Structures are given as structure tokens and as C-alpha cells.
């Protein structure tokens, strides 16, 4: 079992009944978490979310959660502790620690909700921080436990009540002051290009100076995509693109933050493919960040502010569908109706908005192809993004579209349900487990001997490309719509 110097205290592992070898004897154990029962956990008769009788005093038993959308007791009690989630959980696969599995984290939520945890200390928070939020457990669960709702509620509570170490706070502040703001990201493109093309990057690697940086900054540097002058000086897409041939749908396009800045060619390809299939494409200029990174990190107020702005931007256009080409954004956009359920002004508007949101492959798959596909003689390894396959339930549509390209061979990757380690900002704030998962995914991808790796999420593409390079097996990566665009244009291999 690998050593993890960042884990101060470990609990008893349910699968073995033996104390963890990684327990630090010098660190005081958190009360009530020193020993975890190995038998199935029974539901408590106490339910803090039950409305008390009028003559009873209103009490709140939790010492770590406030009453604003804590992890819901009724959702917690749906877990029957069967263990079907364990083989699909990335952190459980790495460490085989019960408290780093969905089942264990749900037990920790229950303890916190029922007042059995005295304070939100480092050990308690660490188990939730190490969850990637990949939702593989949601797909695997036979009881239909909504772990996605539970971890989202828990993370919002952590952000409100737990003060992180100073360096962690500063690093997260850096991330959230840049990533959700496309204009700020764009301002960094020229410095990134100079860093890559001036020889400075090569020199720092050659001298080993990057190893002096904190692991989080090393991870951020390793994930930098190649920046070209074309990317820096690319023109914005037009606000409206007319369909080719008979109009079939009016589709709004979500530009994304990282997508429009570092992967502008993916958005351009998306517009061309949709137009070729008879879709009028509308791109509202006022759209900003969708709030996905914020919501997944527990920054609820910030995420909801972004969501309201996005809804307002698209309400001005009467579209049939709203296309998303970044799976992490898509899963959040489809949840607007739930996220804004308490907002009287936006609840219904959010519900209508979410109903229109689809991954671009869903929209294309529902349309019978009208544009000619040219052959692409390639072996393509398709990577299922977690938020696409688990959160949005989109698995067959990308494969159907790729199968429609003549001479293209789609290769299935082993452990397709296991996360690549990207997971939003996870590979930045948790670089060690993210790196282990990235290399595991890279080895599985490399085993298929592909010409190209294809996925529907920019974070996955960066993570897999970086991981393949790290194991010495570099392979080009592309978004699904880029491959479709190449087939429609017939320009593959023509320079």
C-alpha cells in the first residue's frame, strides 16, 4: 500500500479489521472516528430534518453542519452499505481505506449530521477533499443512492465552516480568481507562449528547478497545453451561424471558460459540425462561466451567481437546445433546476434552461446525419469522461457518431468507468493521487495502441495527454467534435 505523507490520521480499515499502517501516532485522533464498525451500518432513529411537534423545542444536533442544505438524511439512509461502489471508487482503488470510499464518506456525513463529530477538523475534511466527485459510484449503486447530491451539499458545508491552511487558501484563491474568468485566462496566453517558446520552460526542466516548487504548482505547470499564436490572436466566433441545407434545430452554444480560451478550435469545430447538420447556432455574447468549478468545490454562492447570469444570457434567445462540449460544465448546467430550487425568481427559469441543455454528441446523435462523412483510417481510443458517462448518462451517443465515420476503428479502453484523475481542479489541489490515476489511465489507453485519443472534456484531454507523456507513450488527443469535423471537411492528412 503506498505511503501518503499528506494523511495525518487514518481510521481502521473495514475490509481488514487491522489498524492502518499509515496512522501517525503523534497526531491526536479525532473523537468518534478512531474506530469504525465493520458490520453493516444501521440507520439511526434520529432524523434532524424531521419537523418537530409544535410543543417541542427546535434543536439542531449537528456540531459541524448548519441547517442550510446539509447532506440530506433521507438520501444518506438510502445507502444499504452493500459495497458495490467500492470497485468503482478511484480513491478506494488506490488506498483500500473504507473512509476513502463512497460508503465510508456517507457514514462520515451521517456522523456529522447526528452530532457524533465534535468539530470539523483536518482529518474529517480530508476524506471529503480526496473524493474526485467522479460519480462512478452513482452509476454502480443498485439502490440509486444520490451520492452526487450528498457530496455537493457536504462540500458547501466544508467551505462555510472549515478554515483551510494558509497556502491551500491562497492556491485555491488563485484558481478561482482566474479559471472562471475567460478574459483573465486570455490575458495569460501570451506569457504562456513566451514561457514555452523562449526556452525558459526547457531550461527550468533541464536544471530541475521546477522541483523546488510546491507540488500543486508543479502539477499546474505540467498540465499547460501548447499555446500557439493562432490561439492567442483567434477571433471570437460570430453570434449567429446559419445552417447548411434545410434548417432542423436552433441551438445555443455554451462557450465555456477553459474551452473558449485554451481550446478555441473545439468550439469552432462544434459550430461547423452543428451547421453542417442543419442547425442554426446562436452564441450569446453575455454568457460567462457556468459555475461548475465553483459548485464542485463547494463555493455555492459564487456558483449560483454564475448560474443566474448564464440563464439571463440565454433567455434572450428562443433556442430548441443548448449545446455543451465540456462534460464538466454540462453536468452542472443540467443541475440548474436543483441548484436554484430555493430562488423564487429563478427556480422555474432554471428548470426550463436545464431541460434544454444537452451534450453536443446527444444533439448530433438525435439527428439523422445529412452531411457526408469522409474516411479517416485511424485507430481511436475513446475515453469516457466521468461527468459525461456517470453524471449525464451519455455513453452510446459519442460511440455512435464515431462509428459513422468510414474506416475509423473505435477502441475501448480498460477500466473505462475509472476516473483519469482530472476531476475539475482535483489534479491541481490533489496532484499525488491525480498523478497515480492519470498514469493508470495512460497505461490502459496506451495498451490499445491508438493513433489518437478522443474525449468529450477538456480537462480529461489535458490530463491524459500529460500522463501519456509522463510514461513515455505520447499520443495526440482530440475532442470528439474535432474528429467529426475532420471527417466532414475531408481535410485529414492534407496539411
State where each predicted segment sits.
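Non-heme iron-sulfur electron-transfer modules
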Residues: 47-65, 92-126, 144-173, 473-483
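Cysteine-centered iron-sulfur cluster-binding motifs in ferredoxin-type domains/subunits
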Residues: 73-92, 121-145, 387, 417
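N-terminal glycine-rich anion-binding loops that anchor highly charged ligand groups
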Residues: 83-87, 97-102, 280-283
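Short, intrinsically disordered, charge-biased short linear motifs at domain edges
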Residues: 63-76, 117-128, 242, 275-277, ...
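Iron-sulfur cluster-binding electron-transfer modules in prokaryotic oxidoreductases
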Residues: 147-495
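N-terminal glycine-rich, Lys/His-bearing helix-loop that initiates the first secondary-structure elements
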Residues: 2-3, 30-35, 40-44, 48, ...
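N-terminal intrinsically disordered, low-complexity tails
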Residues: 6-52
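Residue-level signal for mature regions of secreted extracellular proteins and peptides
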Residues: 24, 28, 37, 44, ...
